[in-house]
Amino acid sequence: MDVSYNWLNEYVDHDWSPKELAERLTMAGLEVETVRPLGQSLDGVVVGKVTAVREHPNADRLVLCDVDLGDGAPSQIACGAPNVAAGQKVPVATVGTTLSRPDPDDPEALQELTVEARELRGEASNGMICAEDELGLSDDHAGIMVLDDDTPVGTPFPEYLDAHGMPSTDAVLDIELTPNRPDAASHLGVARDVSALADSELRTPTVDTPSPGGPVAEEITVDLRDEAGCPRYVALLVRGVDVTESPLWLRRRLTAIGLQPRNHVVDVTNFVLHECGQPLHAFDLDAIADDTIVVRRTDDETPFTTLDGEERDLPEDTLLICDAEAPVAVAGVMGGANSEVSADTTDVLIESAYFDPSTIRRTAKALDLQTDSSYRFERGVDRDGQVWAAARAAELIAKLGGGTVVPGLVDEHPSPPAEKTIALRPDRLTQVLGTEVPTDEGTRLLGAIGFDVEAGEDALHCTVPTWRPDVSIEEDLIEEVARLHGYDQIPEPERVPVPSRTPEQPPEETLERQARQLLKGLGYREIYTNSMLRTDRAERFNVPPAGSDRAPVVETKNPISEEMAALRPRLLPGALEVMQHNRNHGQEALRVFEFGRVFRRAAEPDDPIVPGYSEHPALLVALSGPHAPTGWDTEPRSADIFDLKGTVETLLDDLRVPALQVRPRDAGATDEAPPVTQHHIDVAAGDTPLGTVARVRDDVAADFDLDTPVFVAEFHWAALVDSATAEQHRDYEPVSRFPVVDRDLAVLVPADQPVGPLQRAIREAGAPLLRRVDVFDTYAGEGIDEDTKSVAFTLRFGADRTLTDEEVDARLDAIVERLAENHGARLRQQ
C-alpha cells in the first residue's frame, strides 16, 4: 500500500525524514518495503506575469509573450499553449533551470530538460512557461498552468506550492500490510500510529455528520435483503453537481499514490478511501430506477458490465447492489458501467457500506478482480466509519463542483455490534514483556491509537475501537503497547530463568511425538492436508473410523470456493490426493501418515464449545506400491494389508496399548454406504474400538489415478491415547533358567478362516505353559480338500521348572480340542 509522506503530514506533526519515518513504522509493525522520492526541487522556476501576447511572425502555432519575472525588463518567451493570455500569473522556468519528468517510453526513467536561451523561428526565447506535467505536478499537458492572480511576481515557485499545501517534492512509502491490520490501510490509519510514536496529536478532518432520516430518506429507498452480506448500508445525496476536473491539490494527492484522476466526483471517493480506509461508490442518481437501492444476491449466473468495460458472468450467490430493475454494482468490488458518473451527471448518490469480508473475498476471487475497495473490505473496514466517510465525500463533492448536500441520510444498520472491552493487567504486561512499562505510558499509547482506557483497581479497562477487529484478548493489547513502546526499548534479560524441572507435557503430545518418530523410522512420510474440501467429496468419504457414529457433513458458511465448502469427516481423501500427486511425479512406493482433526455434527446438541458440532484428533497411516526396492537378492512384491497390519501392531505395541485386539470384521459388516474401503480389520484395546485397517476400493483409488492397491489405517487418536495412558499392571517375568519345549502343529481350516482368531484360541487353551505362538506356513492345493487350507504353527512351552512330555501333550490336546470346537479345525495328518 502506497502512503504519501506529504499527505500523511497533514494529519500529524513529527520531525522525521521519509527514511526515518519508514524505520519507525517498520519497528512498530508496519513494514515499509521501499521509500520512493517524487517530484523535483524546481529551483529556478519563478512566478511570472504575462504582460503582453503577440503572434509569432514565422510560426502559426507559436506566440511571443512578454513576461515580467520581477527582475527588471520583461523577458520574451515563445509559447505554444492554447490558453496563454495577457494578465496571467504563470510558472516560468528561467534560463539554466533543469526540469525532469517520467519518460513516456519507460516510466521508471526520467527525461531531463535544461532551459536555454535560444531562437525559435528567428525570434529569441528566454525561458519556458510551464504546463503541469513539465513541472512534475500531474500528467496534464493541455495548456500552461495558470496561478492565482494575487501571487506576487518573482516568487520562487516552490514557495507558491508550499503556501498552497503542495510541496514540490514528496516521498511514497510502500507499506506491506499484514492481514491483521486493516486499520492501517489508509493515511489516517498510519497517521494514528505515527501520533503514538511521536507523541503528537492526530488531526482528523472535521466533518458535519448528519443524523439518519431527513429529506434524503424521503427521496432514497434502501432495501437491505442480505444483512449477513451487508450489515450496514449508508446513502447520502448531493444535487446540482457540476462534474468537473479536480483541483491540482487533489490530483497531486492521487497521482502520488499511483491513481489516475478522472473527475472531481470519482476523485473525491478515491481520496476519501485512501484518507480513512472506507471504500465509497458514487452513482448517477438518474441511472438508479425508482431512486431505490436493493442489496441482494444473484439467484443464478448473471451477465454484468463493470466500470472497466468488461462484461463478466457473475456466479450464483454474488452479492449485488441493484436498483428497482437491475444490478448497478458488484458489492464491495466494482461499480457498473450502467450507473457511472459522467460529465452529464447532476445528482450524485453516495454509497458507504460495510460488507462481510468473506463474501467480498469470495466474489473478488471468483471474478479474478482485485480493487482498492475489495482489498479493504476483504480485511475488514471500520464498522462505525460509514457515516463519517460519506459525509466527508459529500462535503468535498459539493465544495469542488457546486451542488447541495441533501440534509439527512439513509442508514440501514439492523444489528449494530456490541462494544468490546478488554482488561489489561499491568503485572501481566510486565510478565510478558520482561520489562516494566509505566501505566501512564501504556494508557497514552493505547489512547493515541483510539482505545478508550479507564483505570480500575487491578487493570486497565480498554474499550476497543471499531476499526480494530484484530484486537480481542489481553495479549493483543500487550502487543500494541510493545510495538508502540518499541521492541528495541525492551532490554535483553541478563539471565534467562530455567526451571529446575522440565514441565510435564500432556500425554497426547508425548505419544504423538513418539508415534511420529516410530512411523518415520518405518519409512513413512508425514503429510499435512487441507481440512476443507468439496461437499460431494466430503459426502463420499463421510464414514468415521470405528467407534464413531455416522453424522451429516459439516458445511462451511460463505466458503472461499466450492473446493473448500465442507470440513473433512476423515483424513482419507486428503491422503489420497497427496498419494496421487506423488504418483504423478514418479514416486512408486507410497508410505504416508498424518495427524489431523476431523469434523462432524456433535452427538449431543448442547455441545459446550460449538453447539451441534464437534471435532476430534485422528491418525491416518497409508501405503501403496512396492513393499521394498527391488534388489539382486530380493523378489519384487507389492505391499499388502498384512504389511500395514504389521505397522499398526508395531506402533500400538510401542505405545503400550493394553489388551490389543486386531481381528477381521465379519464379511458385509460395514457402516459405509456407499463403501470406500473393504477387507476391514478392526483394532481395539479390549472392548474399546480404536480404529480400522482396510483396503481402499479399487474404483475409489482409480478416481485418484492410483492403479496399485491402497491400504489405510485410521484411528480415533483420543481413544488410543486414553487406552495407552490407562493405569496398567505389569508383572515382571524373569528369563527362565529352564529349557523350553517347541512343538509344531498343523491344522486344516476353511479357506476363508483368518489366522488371528486361531492364534488367540491357541493362546487361551495353551495357558499357562504356552509362551509363544508363531505361524510358519500356510498351504492350499494338492492333497488338501477344496475350500480348505492348512495353517502350521510353532508353539513354545515353558515354566519355572523343567516340563515333562505329559504336561506339554496335555496342553496340545487342549489346543486341538479348542480349535475344533471354535473353528472346525482338524489336525493335518500329512
Swiss-Prot record:
Its cofactor is Mg(2+). Disulfide bonds: none annotated. Binds 2 magnesium ions per tetramer. CDD domains: PheRS_beta_core, tRNA_bind_bactPheRS. One of its GO terms (molecular function) is tRNA binding. SMART domains: B3_4 (SM00873), B5 (SM00874), FDX-ACB (SM00896). Residues 39-158 form the tRNA-binding domain. Residues 417-492 form the B5 domain. Its main location: cytoplasm. InterPro entries: aa-tRNA-synth_II/BPL/LPL, B3/B4_tRNA-bd, DNA-bd_dom_put_sf, Fdx_antiC-bd, Fdx_antiC-bd_sf, NA-bd_OB-fold, Phe-tRNA-ligase_IIc_bsu, Phe-tRNA-ligase_IIc_bsu_bact. Residues 490-510 are annotated as: Disordered. One of its GO terms (cellular component) is phenylalanine-tRNA ligase complex. Residues 736-828 form the FDX-ACB domain. HAMAP family: Phe_tRNA_synth_beta1. PANTHER family: PHENYLALANINE--TRNA LIGASE BETA SUBUNIT (PTHR10947:SF0), PHENYLALANYL-TRNA SYNTHETASE BETA CHAIN AND LEUCINE-RICH REPEAT-CONTAINING PROTEIN 47 (PTHR10947). This is Phenylalanine--tRNA ligase beta subunit. The lineage of its organism: Bacteria, Pseudomonadati, Rhodothermota, Rhodothermia, Rhodothermales.
